[in-house]
Regions:
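Sec-dependent signal peptide recognition
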Residues: 2-10
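A solvent-exposed, acidic/Ser-Thr-rich amphipathic alpha-helical stretch
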Residues: 71-124, 130-132
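Exposed beta-sheet edge and beta->alpha loop/turn motif
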Residues: 133-172
Length: 184
């Protein structure tokens, strides 16, 4: 009886120590749905899947180039058909136009961004092609013309194509302040 119980205990021990690596590795290679989106030109929700993590390094290099005012690196990372959509509704199209706007802005301002988080994601567009996106949370700081500090929370939704930044949507929120009033 003692041997029987010992044998059962050993079998249970071996089962509990079984390597689950094979199960986990097949999950990594499969498509993992992490959400859904109504992509431009579509009429129904499209699954959002895990995107290319390597785009995070491109974004970090891009932000560093902005902080360093390095227009050459920014232009190198931008796709020629780059598009930018700001929180105030402004739209800018083209790598050259983007660099000109930044050059003028950098002459009179010293904007800085700090990346706080990034989520690589992808989804099929209206043509069935997988688009690579990176959604990021960033802190933006600068000083206005009166010397007042500017602080905003920015969310950038960035589309990548062939290792280049093709499109950026910028959303912003002011620094949190406790208030007796609350507005939407």
């Amino acid at each position: 009886m003692k041997k029987y119980i010992t044998s059962i205990m050993l079998v249970l021990l071996f089962i509990s120590c079984t390597n689950n690596q094979q199960k986990n590795s097949t999950k990594k290679n499969s498509v993992i749905e992490i959400g859904s989106a109504l992509m431009d030109g579509t009429n129904e929700m499209t699954p959002i899947i895990v995107g290319e993590i390597s785009n995070q390094e491109i974004w970090l290099k891009y932000i560093k180039a902005h902080n360093d005012k390095n227009l050459d690196i920014i232009a190198e990372i931008n796709a020629e058909d780059w598009e930018g959509y700001t929180a105030d509704g402004s739209v800018l199209k083209g790598n050259k136009a983007h660099i000109e706007v930044l050059d003028n802005w950098f002459k009179s301002a010293n904007p800085k961004w700090k990346v706080k988080w990034m989520i690589a994601n992808a989804a099929k567009n209206k043509d069935g092609i997988i688009e690579q996106w990176l959604t990021t949370g960033n802190e933006y700081t600068d000083v206005d013309e009166n010397g007042n500090e500017i602080f905003e929370h920015n969310v950038h939704d960035i589309q990548f194509a062939d290792g280049k930044i093709k499109k950026i949507y910028v959303y912003k929120r002011a620094k949190a302040q406790e208030s007796a009033e609350f507005s939407y």
